[in-house]
């Protein structure tokens, strides 16, 4: 059953050094605030999982939190590369980063398999792809019914999944809407799950076909309005396109990046203080 906790307490209690951690969101509802708190608390040796790692993963990797990344595509969407990710892979800064690359269909199916308690996922998606040449975990299996040769990949079962959502009720049930990726599957596949939300209400009033995660599947719910910034939360906040553009020069240089992390994450007590400091800096320009 989910507890209503501060984000600080949830990360302290449920994220451990050496864990496999998935921070999932697709286009919107990206759990940036939780990623910042992981950096702030100095968690390390993490295996990070994400279908489309973007800015928060660049920050986690550059801050030295990660030893491995399991992913399918990574970049600053609409802008370019993740420079801290590239520096870690190409030049081992701040230390070496192991990478395990998959296709989108592969990783989505791996989450589904994990949520179903299965050891692996099966798919057809690797016909004509070179990914099996660089990822030895992509295997071939023969269908016992048709004889067709298929691809098989290990299921993804994170120690901790972290997502951002629009609403939770006081019992810890969570409601998401808008564009969804694999948040539901990632949450159900994990041993523990932290959800940051825009608001906590008495009654979810979930519309038909909405995605509702039950309290029994979650570990903690944290009230963090705006916690998906710079991505958006459908119905609550807009995407901060300027931040995505501004991140590119910050991340390109090690000293500039380190100064930004020290000022805006280590130099703030929580995400509310981070947002206030960011707003003041923006107004001063």
Where are each of the predicted segments found?
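Conserved alpha/beta enzyme-core scaffold
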Residues: 1-285
């Amino acid at each position: 059953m989910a507890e209503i906790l501060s984000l600080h307490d949830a990360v302290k209690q449920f994220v451990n050094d050496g864990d496999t951690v998935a921070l999932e969101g697709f286009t919107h509802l990206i759990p940036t605030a939780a990623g910042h708190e992981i950096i702030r608390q100095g968690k390390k040796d993490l295996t990070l999982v994400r279908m489309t790692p973007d800015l928060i993963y660049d920050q986690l990797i550059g801050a030295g939190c990660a030893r491995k990344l399991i992913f399918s595509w990574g970049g600053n969407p609409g802008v370019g590369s993740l420079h801290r990710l590239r520096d870690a892979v190409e030049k081992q800064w701040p230390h070496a980063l192991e990478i395990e690359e998959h296709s989108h269909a592969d990783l989505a199916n791996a989450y589904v398999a994990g949520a179903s308690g299965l050891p692996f996922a099966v798919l057809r998606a690797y016909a004509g792809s070179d990914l099996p040449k660089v990822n030895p975990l992509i295997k071939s299996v023969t269908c016992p019914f048709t004889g067709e040769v298929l691809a098989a990949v290990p299921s993804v079962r994170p120690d901790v999944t972290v997502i951002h959502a629009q609403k939770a009720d006081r019992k810890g049930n969570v409601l998401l809407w808008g564009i969804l990726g694999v948040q539901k599957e990632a949450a159900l596949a994990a041993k523990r799950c932290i959800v940051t939300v825009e608001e906590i209400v008495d009654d979810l009033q979930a519309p038909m076909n909405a995605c509702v995660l039950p309290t029994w599947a979650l570990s903690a719910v944290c009230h963090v309005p705006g916690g998906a910034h710079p991505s958006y939360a459908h119905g609550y906040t807009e995407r901060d396109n300027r931040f995505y553009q501004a991140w590119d020069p910050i991340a390109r240089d090690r000293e500039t990046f380190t100064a930004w992390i020290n000022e805006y994450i280590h130099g703030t007590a929580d995400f509310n203080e981070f947002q206030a400091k960011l707003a003041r800096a923006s107004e001063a320009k």
